Amino acid sequence: MENMAEDLRQKAMALEIYNQQLQMIQSEITSIRALKSEIMNSIKTIENIKADEETLIPVGPGVFLKAKIVDDKALIGVKSDIYVEKSFNEVIEDLKKSVEDLDKAEKEGMKKAEELAKAITALRKELQTEIQKAQQAQDKKQ
């Protein structure tokens, strides 16, 4: 009986750990989706900007500066305080590559989440069965 109780505790702890891992993965997927959305918005913005055109540059919540685009180049951060100048087309290609990488990461995360959800369901069923057996054994003793 004591082995059964210990087994139940271990499985309950494993179930809790699996649930925490699933929440972490779901949080990562949410972050990936938000980043993808931000990158897609950047791509649309860059595609619509033309040289010699006036635009608004966001500098804070609800604060914009009027600016004139002088050419079709952008500065891209590659490391801390290191920037590389690239054409809008190159930037768009780099951003599209980032979206592809994020798509792969999202799919991997979804696959892991699905596997973990199946493991959680199986462990939960197993735990419920063992709890019922323990209750039946307890009832027989009484």
Swiss-Prot record:
Swiss-Prot/TrEMBL keywords: Chaperone, Cytoplasm
GO cellular component, one term: cytoplasm
Molecular function GO labels: unfolded protein binding
Primary location recorded for the protein, binned into one broad class: cytoplasm
Annotated transmembrane regions: none
Keyword 4Fe-4S set for record: no
UniProt subcellular location: Cytoplasm
Gene Ontology BP annotations: protein folding
CDD domains: Prefoldin_alpha_GimC
SUPFAM superfamilies (UniProt xref): Prefoldin (SSF46579)
Similarity comment text for this entry: Belongs to the prefoldin subunit alpha family.
Subunit structure: Heterohexamer of two alpha and four beta subunits.
Described purpose of this protein according to its UniProt entry: Molecular chaperone capable of stabilizing a range of proteins. Seems to fulfill an ATP-independent, HSP70-like function in archaeal de novo protein folding.
Record protein name field: Prefoldin subunit alpha 1
